[in-house]
């Protein structure tokens, strides 16, 4: 008599897991500062939640992460590292260290850092993610630019250039076509959001990036796929 209840329990747990997996949480670490009384990190569920004082580049990254795929991410958590654009290495190191410490107790699934390659921190983040997963059992993943996917917690994104074309309407009604070009590190937030918005029941391998008009194209697709790139 006990077997049916066990089977039902497994089915219910599986259904719950699928539901939980429909919308993941993205975390962004950005070189920006939140003005009081805002609390760092800030949680963004809709665009209305984006603080007014953030840099345009930060806002753009948040919006990229929020696009998602089948679904939008459940939310985007934005941690402002307080690092100036022209900061020295010591300040950059300190900012990243604080971000790591703060993120250890925050629930999220996918991490992206729009300046991680510029800051020369990709390998440090890869090491941190591996430690979080293997030692502290926090099953997070990071989307990193041009970083070997030698661990299940590392998602290697390598496309050199992605171009978004959109039509902007001025106050006088004049329409202008504007191209926005993203480097590899700048588009990692989009990839993190896409994966977070992919239900467990489907794959995102060939997910369309409908906002793009152009990107760096591969002459040979087999080698990157074989290498999980």
Q: Language model features by range: what are they?
A:
Residues 16-19, 59, 186, 213:
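General helical secondary-structure elements
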Residues 30-122:
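An N-terminal, globular interaction/scaffold subdomain
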Residues 1-23:
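Short, intrinsically disordered N-terminal pre-domain segments
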Residues 22, 28-31:
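N-terminal leader/targeting segments
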Residues 38, 91-96, 101-229:
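A glycine- and small-residue-enriched flexible loop/hinge signal that marks low-structured segments
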Residues 16-19, 41, 192:
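Short, flexible coil/turn micro-motifs enriched in small/turn-prone residues
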Residues 5-9, 43, 77, 165-169, ...:
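Ser/Thr- (and often Asn-) enriched beta-sheet segments in non-cytosolic proteins
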